[in-house]
């Protein structure tokens, strides 16, 4: 970890800096003029004074003569402002609460009669697992309870899982990496300089904001594929608009996510769509329509239920006949009944994917690439995926090997969780460093104590990493090699330790002060995360390309690709609009010096 940062600094739920660098637009309202003049000299002196009631006033003067007094209003900061500001590393608490919160959702529901909005909701896999763990019910029953809450009690029209958006994201992510790997050049916005290092995932908005604001040299290496949240939002709004024959601006999309930074992701300018809207005068005006209108977390949903007793997620008793479906409908029938009529692949619309609990991007890249090679004539029975552990449980590497005993590495991917590991990776990828061949060799094949390697293998096995080998099967030569994420084809990066299953918006473990449990709080939290992971893994699986069905899996992937092309043609949406995003370095607008006491006071102790 950098000596300039402390553990407190890495919190992804922080307040805006005292010296916010976003300029404020001045308002000419609430003005009083003591000396009138035909013209206002903007070059005059301006003072800020406090009146007798404590209100701030802006007083304009020229030659000591007072011309105009403006009553100042409180500064308003939007999510878009935060994205363009370099003052905070990730998100700002007050801004998130003000614009994406359960209170805003309640206000929107209360004003439904005036706005005529149609409400739809999408729910992430990790949030479902967190809620199921908190209420000690199965994933199936939690899904029924969520459908009951949003459809019957809160008046939502449709509810969907994020599985379709995730699978399309996984496929396009793998396509981008494979294209660069096979062609040897950048694709999808990745320039030629990125060919010397791995493609870095951009699914985690906390990591993306960190890169944009502190390490802009990393941006060319980042994947430009959108996250499941944003793809789902685009699909859901267009299909709902088509199904109900209404404008997309009349649709309010709520997304339930495991992370607070997902709120900022929904405010990125490239996820808005311009739509013509008829006004009362029959004139048409362009309005910006976001793919996601509001993002709340599982933790915030619990807060909403506590503040609004008219809503109940779990009935006092849980008889099957009182749940959605009445105990006689299958889950597929239930999902179909409450999704838009034109929602595709309904049987897998709430299903899970193999790999990490953050979506399995690294693992699915390897399996999709394996299927791509099978279609080119490779023997599917000769593939294996080997696990290489890192120096801590939050970093590991997977290698796609071929040809039995004479194994050849065809592809590799790594998973990196937590800011400590992210900082180490970013440091290795910094330009003009590590050019020495000897240094590279040493880094790639760093030796470690075999006992430590066995311990990491045991931890990985217990955590259920995909296709991991048992300790006895791990080759001794492999065990002496430490995972190096800077040398792989692709890196799945998540800001939170343990990934999205431990996102900042997930429901926390019970506190030792409020329970009779005598275990240390850290141990309780560890057990809680493992239990939530078990709930997550209990979600029915639908692999895009599992090895056991490698002959048919490519056809499944083709089905998703063909459907997405039909969707783009039907709604006149480009491939870039549906699947691609872009990133820009955030320029620092103020120059700070650690030797300047005044600057240090303005910035505060956080950064």
UniProtKB/Swiss-Prot annotation:
Residues bound to [4Fe-4S] cluster 1: 20, 82, 85, 88
InterPro entries noted in UniProt: Cytosolic_Fe-S_CAF, Fe_hydrogenase, Fe_hydrogenase_lsu_C
Gene (name only): NAR1
Any keyword DNA-binding? Answer: no
Cellular compartments per GO CC: cytosolic [4Fe-4S] assembly targeting complex
Matching SUPFAM superfamilies, A to Z?
Fe-only hydrogenase
Give the protein name, as stated in the record: Cytosolic Fe-S cluster assembly factor NAR1
Signal sequence extent: none
- Free-text function comment from the UniProt entry: Component of the cytosolic Fe/S protein assembly machinery. Required for maturation of extramitochondrial Fe/S proteins. May play a role in the transfer of pre-assembled Fe/S clusters to target apoproteins.
Is Cell inner membrane one of the keywords UniProt gives this record?
no
Matches recorded under PANTHER family: NITRATE, FORMATE, IRON DEHYDROGENASE (PTHR11615)
């Amino acid at each position: 970890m950098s000596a300039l940062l402390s553990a407190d600094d890495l919190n992804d739920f922080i307040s805006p800096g005292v010296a916010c660098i976003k300029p404020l637009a001045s308002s000419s309202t609430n003005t009083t003029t003591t000396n009138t003049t035909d013209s206002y000299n903007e070059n005059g002196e301006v003072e800020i004074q406090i009146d007798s009631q404590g209100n701030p006033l802006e007083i304009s003067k020229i030659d000591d003569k007072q011309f105009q007094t403006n009553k100042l209003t409180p500064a308003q900061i939007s999510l878009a402002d935060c994205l363009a500001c370099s003052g905070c590393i990730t998100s700002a608490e007050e801004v998130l609460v003000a614009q994406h919160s359960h209170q805003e959702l309640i206000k929107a529901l209360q004003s439904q009669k005036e706005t005529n909005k149609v409400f739809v909701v999408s729910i992430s896999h990790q949030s479902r697992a967190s809620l199921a763990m908190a209420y000690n019910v199965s994933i199936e029953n939690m899904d029924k309870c969520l459908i009951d809450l949003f459809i019957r009690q809160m008046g939502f029209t449709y509810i969907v899982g994020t599985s379709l958006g995730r699978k399309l994201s996984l496929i396009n992510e793998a396509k981008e990496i494979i294209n660069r790997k096979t062609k040897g050049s950048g694709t999808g916005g990745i320039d030629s300089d990125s060919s010397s290092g791995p493609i870095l995932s951009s699914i985690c908005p906390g990591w993306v904001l960190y890169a944009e604001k502190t390490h802009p040299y990393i941006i060319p290496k980042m994947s430009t594929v959108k996250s499941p949240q944003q793809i789902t939002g685009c699909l859901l709004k267009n299909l709902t608009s088509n199904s109900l024959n209404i404008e997309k601006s009349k649709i309010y999309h709520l997304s339930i996510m495991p992370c607070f930074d997902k709120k900022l992701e929904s405010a990125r300018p490239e996820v808005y769509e311009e739509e013509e809207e008829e006004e009362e005068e029959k004139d048409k005006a362009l309005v910006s329509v976001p793919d996601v209108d509001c993002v709340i977390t599982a933790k915030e949903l619990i807060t909403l239920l506590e503040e609004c007793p008219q809503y109940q997620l779990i009935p006092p008793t849980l008889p099957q006949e009182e749940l959605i479906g009445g105990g006689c409908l299958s889950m597929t029938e239930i999902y179909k009944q409450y999704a838009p009529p034109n929602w595709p692949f309904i049987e897998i619309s709430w299903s899970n994917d193999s790999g990490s609990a953050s979506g399995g991007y690294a693992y699915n890249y390897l399996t999709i690439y394996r299927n791509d090679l099978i279609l080119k004539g490779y023997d599917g029975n000769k593939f294996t995926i080997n696990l290489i552990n890192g120096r801590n449980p939050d970093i590991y590497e997977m290698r796609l090997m071929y040809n039995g005993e004479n194994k050849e590495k065809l592809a590799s991917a790594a998973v990196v969780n937590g800011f400590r590991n992210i900082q180490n990776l970013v440091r290795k990828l910094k330009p003009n460093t590590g050019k020495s061949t000897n240094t590279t060799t040493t880094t790639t094949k760093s030796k470690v104590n075999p006992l430590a390697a066995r311990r990491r293998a045991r931890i990985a096995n217990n955590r259920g990493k995909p296709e991991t080998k048992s300790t006895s099967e791990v080759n001794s030569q492999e065990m002496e090699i430490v995972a190096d994420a800077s040398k792989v084809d692709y890196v799945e990066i998540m800001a939170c330790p343990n990934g999205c299953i431990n996102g900042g918006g997930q429901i926390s473990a019970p506190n030792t002060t409020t329970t009779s449990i005598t275990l240390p709080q850290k141990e309780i939290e560890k057990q809680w995360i493992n239990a939530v992971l078990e709930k997550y893994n209990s979600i029915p699986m639908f692999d895009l390309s599992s090895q056991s069905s490698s002959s048919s899996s490519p056809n499944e992937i083709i089905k998703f690709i063909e459907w997405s092309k039909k969707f783009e043609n039907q709604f006149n949406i480009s491939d870039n609009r549906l699947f691609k995003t872009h990133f820009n370095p955030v320029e620092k607008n103020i120059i700070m010096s650690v030797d300047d006491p005044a600057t240090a006071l303005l910035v505060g102790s956080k950064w």
